[in-house]
Amino acid sequence: MMRPEEIYQRIEAKNWRHVWVVGDIHGCFSMLMKRLRECRFDPQQDLLVSVGDLIDRGPDSLGCLALLRESWMTAVRGNHEQMALDARASSQSTLWLMNGGDWFTRLTAEHAAQAEALFILCQRLPWILEVRCRHSTHVIAHADYPASTYQWQKKVDLHQVLWSRERLINKRGGISGADHFWFGHTPLRRRMDFANVHYIDTGAVFGGQLTLARIQ
């Protein structure tokens, strides 16, 4: 059973000039680099936070996974990272392979070893990240924060954190306890915002755009 301190992490945004949140990247490394240049992202002063799903389906999952080593990049875990971790732990890889994990089977031995080392970093990714900015508090998770009120280290259903689309489908409303909530997981034609909830997976790997939002 996961301890609350392994599920939640907190970041003080005062340590950076700007903080950006990015939607599901899914291996689209070159697209991400292009968008960062367009946003004038400065890796010396800025922080990029991913809503998860760095890997699978796109052309460079290994390159995107390697971003976890960069000091200017952090992420919450997505359902695709979790599928990869589950596959590596159990040797039951069917679900992962059916959902874009076949890139791993095509790696050279050298690159596979690199990926295995990076999956260790994935094990440390939180499910929920709280970012304390100068004038607001932002909560980032992959698919949902499955409660009507946010509370630091509150017990929540982790499967729903990674997989749920209920709030988005039903437009169930906002969440109290923080100023803004940022999710990905469900590819949309354009960013969707209602109440204080923001969905920013705009289907980059399916021919859409890669959405970045500056929260500080």
From Swiss-Prot:
Entry annotation: catalytic residues: 80
The reaction(s) this protein catalyses: O-phospho-L-seryl-[protein] + H2O = L-seryl-[protein] + phosphate; O-phospho-L-threonyl-[protein] + H2O = L-threonyl-[protein] + phosphate
EC number: 3.1.3.16
GO cellular component: cytoplasm
Keywords for the protein's UniProt record, in alphabetical order: Hydrolase, Manganese, Metal-binding, Protein phosphatase
Temperature dependence: Optimum temperature is 45-55 degrees Celsius. Thermostable.
Membership in a protein family: Belongs to the PPP phosphatase family. PP-1 subfamily.
Protein name in the entry: Serine/threonine-protein phosphatase 1
Name of encoding gene: pphA
